[in-house]
Amino acid sequence: MVRKSTRRTAKASEKPPETVVRCVCKSQEDIGDTWVQCDGCDCWQHASCVGLADKDIPESYYCEVCHSRSDVSSQVQNSPNKDEEHQTADLLASNEGNEKNNEENNVVSSDSKEAITKESGAELESSEPASTNSNVGMTTRSGRQSPRTPIGSTTPKSSHSPPSTRKRRGSVGTTATHTKRSKNAPKTSPKDASNETADQEKELSLHTSIDEIQNPVRKSVAKAWVSVFEKIIEKAKLEGVQGLEDLNSTSLALQLEHIMFMVLSYTTDHSLTPNNKYREKFRALRFNLVDDKNPAFRARVLKNEISFNDLVNLSSEEMANPDLKNLAEEIRQQSTENTVIKQHLIAPRDRLLDEDKLTQQDELGIAENDDAMFPKPPGELVAPISIAEEEPTIDSKSPTLPEHNPLSEDDTSNGDKAAKRKGSFNDTKPIVNVPSIVEIDDPTILDIVEEEPLARNDSFSSPYSPAEDMAEESEFFGMKEKIWTGKVKMATVSEFHANALNLFGDVSASHLFEILSATALIEGRISVSSVLQYFHALRKTPSKEIIAVLFVPTEQNSQGFDILYDYFVKRNRYGVLHSKSNSVKDAYIIPMPSGNSVPELLDLLPKVDLPKDRNFQYFMGLFVLNKSSSRHESVERATPITTSTNGIPSTYQSASGTPTNPVHSYPSLESIINALTPSDMLLIKDVVENNPQIRANPSLAINPQFMQNAISAAQKKASKQ
């Protein structure tokens, strides 16, 4: 066996450190093979090039250079030549076994070795005998040829060495605790990797202080939880909750934040950066915990009746006030019962109609077998699907009455009697636009859950008490018309109760309720410069109309008002209001400071009458309306409907089947209400309460075309059941 000398010359000792990747194949490319790192010089080598299989990589490994420099073992010091011979034999034997499975076994002669040794020169003298662990023509797993033919041997001298010698290869010297293997090219040192692992383990553990949290998002959430727990603990004590003396807001905040991150973010993404689910759950939990309407939920969390692990998995419905949930469930059950009652009322109602038909036939002198005059009961009517139907039903008729009775023009006595009887069958049975003339003031489930005051179209009643300590500005408020009372709300931020005073512009109480409903919802925020630029352009647009109102909080020093006011002032932003009316193009809410200063936006508006010395802060609402749309809607609200919903002139089907001329009379409200049976009222109520489109947009309840289609769909659904 031929081996190199282990003597290091002065020239070799002065050689600069090797590169990070230094394999015996002289290649630094990553070909997808397994890499192994030396415990001595931290250089990386292909495992296949040094004769190691993937399953045989030891815990500690030393390259050929570091192995020759190791002088820890006394056995190596006493007989270095023998040890080198054993080590070389081990490498050759291991490499030979690996080559039998993957490649052909090639042998190089000693003459080839001497030729290569002369070419390598001083560099070859400073290398280790273990570097000759490959035979001539040996290729790596990727199939590439080694650029230099390593020195091999036909028969190792130490072939009698036991297998334990191979396992001990690379274990001389220091011992390592981790196997250094990598499927990719090495880029970081083991020290950096261990530091990253330690930092990751520290970040995933439960922290004892907020300063230990490295991620800025998690640190911000933890600080917010500290503030929330301090607030809700004080609220719970005022609400009479006992056993909260030992609670530590910081400890609770760190525990909840850690569980939120581990359950909602890290378990799913395996990343130290919180995901969107983590952020959304934080907003939902914070809103429900600080909600004054939900003290029961807050007390259960503080008394640990709901653990943090269960808390982060609760839905919005599970966190809601239990009283409101029970009330909503009762409403749903009542709606179901109403549907069943409506189905059972159909048969008795038919019998009543038969008796009524006989009575009216006697009075009007109509033959008993003439069924053409009597329309079907409202419970069986079907609304028209399209205008082009060949046989229009009575639903397509206009809600108008004929000026004269076409059935008995000669019989004056019967005609007078029919004129006096406004509740007669022929005068009232044709279907009318019930939602347009009947007030629908039953609260929906959404209104009950949110506890919003019910808005009515004909009158205005304030469910809240006015502010008491505004004597300084009472004269100004007395001069302004209060046109709205409700709640100003921005989700996840704050809300407060307020009255709206008309500053300028033509707007009525009913119109403002139509725009805002009972809650003025702030959808988002917008920069001040954008609003200024927009209103500056509106000055040159005559087709737009601007209405301004002043939102005055109904409770002095309202905490919700202060939070929302500071939210916009600190960010130098205006709010964007949600409008439910098509006539409103844009709507904004502007913070009004106290004192004499006013926002720059007021210079672009008509002269606004405000108190000279304002002692309090307010919000001003600005609504940009389309003049044509607002005028058209006001006309529609004031003028009765005299045409059908599809724009077809009103007609009435006579007994002979010939339609009469269009008429423009409108039935009285009393006659319409008398014409509706209990089942009709239940049907209308069921549609208004349970139709998802009406719940999303309540203004659809006064849309005749939509209500006709909705009632028709409900009738068809009930008939199939």
From Swiss-Prot:
Protein's UniProt keywords contain Protein biosynthesis: no
Function: Negative regulator of transcription elongation.
GO terms for MF: transcription elongation factor activity; zinc ion binding
Coarse class of the protein's main subcellular location: nucleus
Record's compositionally biased regions (Polar residues): 128-152, 640-661
Record bears the keyword Ion transport: no
Gene3D superfamilies given in the database record: Transcription elongation factor S-II, central domain, Zinc/RING finger domain, C3HC4 (zinc finger)
Family label: Belongs to the BYE1 family.
Bias type Low complexity, positions: 153-164
Gene Ontology cellular-component terms listed: chromatin; nucleus; protein-containing complex
Protein's recorded name: Transcription factor bye1
Domain spans labelled TFIIS central: 217-347
Recorded name of the encoding gene: bye1
Record keywords: Metal-binding, Nucleus, Repressor, Transcription, Transcription regulation, Zinc, Zinc-finger
An annotated GO BP: chromatin remodeling
PANTHER family found in the cross-reference section: TRANSCRIPTION FACTOR BYE1, TRANSCRIPTION FACTOR S-II ZINC FINGER DOMAIN-CONTAINING PROTEIN
One Pfam family cited in the UniProt record for this chain: PHD_5
Cellular localization per UniProt: Nucleus
Region of interest (Disordered), residue spans: 93-209, 391-426, 636-661
ZnF (PHD-type) intervals: 20-69
Compositionally biased intervals (Basic and acidic residues): 111-121, 189-205
